[in-house]
């Protein structure tokens, strides 16, 4: 697999709608950086959050996810409680080409503050807003800034298109919009 350059990412985003909205140059003016980088794209977090809480003594079960496990917030600054977790989504909508696998890494700005961003790979043929998982590993409240950089996506091109894409098998998260909870 080959990691794809800024030139390729720009072309796919502008001609094929791979990333919408697309920010062509990295923005760093007084914010956590986002936009096109040399070999990746730094995506922004939207102002839509689901913050985990234990007010109702719920148990987190991926097979039977209880909606009372979290509170919804629309805000420019999300505060994640100590040793807690929040879900969010990217501002950008992604359309992954059939011969590409996308992996995501957290931003060092957040990592150096004990905030871990996790995203599973974006499979060939998948499209949607990416649900972001933020873990606050510290004993202190932690801030996440909406409309600023959250993570970096790296685009890996395979040696040929896959036989069966995520779209072909009608994957359960295909076309997701907004923060998407676990599905079976």
Curated annotation (Swiss-Prot):
The gene is dcd. Belongs to the dCTP deaminase family. Disulfide bonds: none annotated. This is dCTP deaminase. Pathway: Pyrimidine metabolism; dUMP biosynthesis; dUMP from dCTP (dUTP route): step 1/2. GO terms for biological process: dUMP biosynthetic process; dUTP biosynthetic process. The active site is at 133 (proton donor/acceptor). DCTP binds at residues 107-112, 131-133, 152, 166, 176. It comes from the Bacteria. Homotrimer. Transmembrane segments: none annotated. GO terms for molecular function: dCTP deaminase activity; nucleotide binding. Catalyzes the deamination of dCTP to dUTP. Pfam families: DCD. It comes from Rhizorhabdus wittichii (strain DSM 6014 / CCUG 31198 / JCM 15750 / NBRC 105917 / EY 4224 / RW1) (Sphingomonas wittichii). It catalyses: dCTP + H2O + H(+) = dUTP + NH4(+). It is an enzyme of class 3 (hydrolase). InterPro entries: dCTP_deaminase, dUTPase-like_sf, dUTPase_trimeric. Keywords: Hydrolase, Nucleotide metabolism, Nucleotide-binding. Its EC number is 3.5.4.13.
């Amino acid at each position: 697999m080959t990691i794809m350059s800024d030139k390729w990412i720009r072309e796919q985003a502008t001609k094929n709608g791979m990333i919408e909205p697309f920010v062509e140059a990295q923005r760093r003016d007084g914010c956590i950086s986002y936009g096109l980088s040399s070999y990746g794209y730094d995506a922004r977090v939207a102002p839509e959050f689901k913050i985990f809480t234990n007010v109702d003594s719920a148990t987190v079960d991926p097979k039977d996810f209880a909606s009372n496990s979290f509170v919804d917030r629309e805000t420019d600054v999300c505060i994640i409680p100590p040793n807690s977790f929040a879900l969010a989504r990217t501002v950008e909508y992604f359309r992954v080409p059939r011969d590409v696998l996308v992996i995501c890494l957290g931003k060092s700005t957040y990592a150096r503050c004990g905030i871990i961003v996790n995203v599973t790979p974006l499979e060939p043929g998948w499209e949607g807003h990416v649900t972001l998982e933020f873990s606050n590993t510290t004993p202190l409240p932690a801030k996440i800034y909406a409309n600023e950089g959250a993570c970096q996506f790296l685009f890996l091109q395979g040696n040929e298109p896959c036989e069966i894409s995520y779209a072909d098998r009608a994957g359960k998260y295909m076309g997701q919009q907004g923060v998407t909870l676990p599905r079976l």
